[in-house]
Amino acid sequence: MITVNLNRTEFEYDIHSLLKAFFPKEDVEIYYTKEAHAEEKNVACTNHSAENETESASHFSITYEDKQISITCTLENQKPAECTFAVDFADRAETKNALKENLYYLLEEVTGQSLPWGTLTGIRPTKIPMQLLDEGKSEREVADYMKKTYLASDEKIDLSIAIAERERTLLSKLDYKKGYSLYIGIPF
C-alpha cells in the first residue's frame, strides 16, 4: 500500500491517478492533516485523517505552502527523495501541471520507469491536440507543447495528433454542435 499525506485537498485526483499509473498493483490511500480539514469543509467521507494513518512501507507527503509545493517520497528499502518547486496558486492549471510534472520526475527517479503518456491520466488524450489544432497551432507546436507540458513520448504524441486530425476531418462534415456526441473509450 502507498499512503499520501496532504495538507490541502487540491489536486487529489491528479496525484492519485499518477501514483496508480506508476504503481498499478498498489492501493493508494490519501490522508489529510488537520489543517486540510480546517481549510476544506467538504472533504469526502472516503478520505481519512492523518491520525488514522497506518504505517506504510511507501509514503508520500505533499505540502502546499505559500508560493511553493514540497513533495517527499519514501519507498520501501530506498533512500527518501524530495523536491520543492515554486507555484502560482492563482493559476490553477499551471499549478496542477507543475505539480504533476514534478511528481512525475520524482516517480521516474525512484522507480526507474517512465510512462508513454507522461502525466496524462484519466483523460481523452486527443482532446488536447484537437483543441490546439483548432486554435491554429501547427502539428510541431502541438507536439512541442505535449512534450513540454505532459512529458508524453514522441510515439504517443504522434498517435494523438494523427487521431485528432482524423477526428477533425470527420467532425468537419457534421453539425456536431447542435447534435449529440457519443464517446467510446478504446485504450491506446
List each model region and its residues.
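A short, structured N-terminal alpha-helical element that caps or precedes a catalytic domain
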Residues: 1-109, 113-115
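Cysteine-centered iron-sulfur cluster-binding motifs in ferredoxin-type domains/subunits
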Residues: 185-188
